[in-house]
Amino acid sequence: SIIGIKILLSRYFLGLLFQITILFTIYTIILLMFGVKDAVVIAFLCALLNLIPYIGPLIGIILMSFLTMTSYLGEDFSSVIIPKTAYVIIGYVIAQLIDNFLSQPYIFSNSIKSHPLEIFIVVLSSGILFGIVGMILAIPLYTVMKVFLKVFFSNNALVKKLTKNI
């Protein structure tokens, strides 16, 4: 069972790394397209913030917007700063849509062998019960719990259904 946990958690963390890489690439392209200073650093920070479920992307869009505006200090506010910031925000939203509807469900369902709805329910309920820390730890702990249940309660019908792909 320890080996099963190790394998699934390794796959989960590789999936997170892949997700961060995808977002980092998209964010970097967006920021470089609009000439934002320190685009790579901003993209990296916002991609890392995306690891915090639901709240991280909100913090990321605020950070990216603010740093985009400060990148154009000295420029005309209405003709340069507002339009460039708006384009960056649109790009950020598109990147989030790609992440939330394409890459994240595919990566997580393949890495930890769970349905995307199952992952959503686990993260949401953990967030309600334990806050942000619960949301961050939800998937790794759920993965450990699934392996534990499969090893010790493999005859239970519900456990069989939840762990059939492990």
Say what each PLM segment does.
Residues 1-69, 78:
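Alpha-helical transmembrane segments and their immediate interhelical loop/hinge regions
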Residues 16, 37, 58-59, 76, ...:
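Short alpha-helix boundary/capping motifs
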Residues 69-70, 149:
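Structural signal for the C-terminal ends of transmembrane alpha-helices
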Residues 74-80:
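Intrinsically disordered, low-complexity Ser/Thr- and acidic-rich flexible linkers and loops
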Residues 81-166:
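Hydrophobic alpha-helical transmembrane segments of membrane transport and translocation systems
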